[in-house]
Amino acid sequence: LGLASDGLGKKSESKKHFDKAITNLNEKIIEYPNDPRFYTTLGLIYARLGKNKDAVEAGLEATRILPISKDAMFGPTFEKSLSSIYSIIGEKNIALEKIEFLSSIPSGFHYGELLRDPSFDSIRNEPRFQEVLKNLKPQS
């Protein structure tokens, strides 16, 4: 609901939903401290709220819990979310570095995902991003 409200420009309503989600996620983190899903979601919410330091810390924690080196199938999911966090908070170069890497590995980014994900709106027109899209575009 926070994302939907934010997309409609209803900032105060969006913040209310995000704050409630943060409370719920923090409770889940206490209950399941080794579940990276809660950290990555928390990081994405913090990024949307402009809490950049908290966003990056939560995103990094998710990647520490389940790194690609430990799980090549699901580990990239959390690195992908971290690249979204970096993009949302305006850390373009870090986001692009991650996207370039993640577009080159199995279980990494695919064309449609990058093409449509609003998390990458801030870097969509960057030449490096466009190059990744070009390389991932399915051949017909």
Where do the protein language model's features map onto the residues?
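Alpha-helical protein-protein interaction modules
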Residues: 1-140
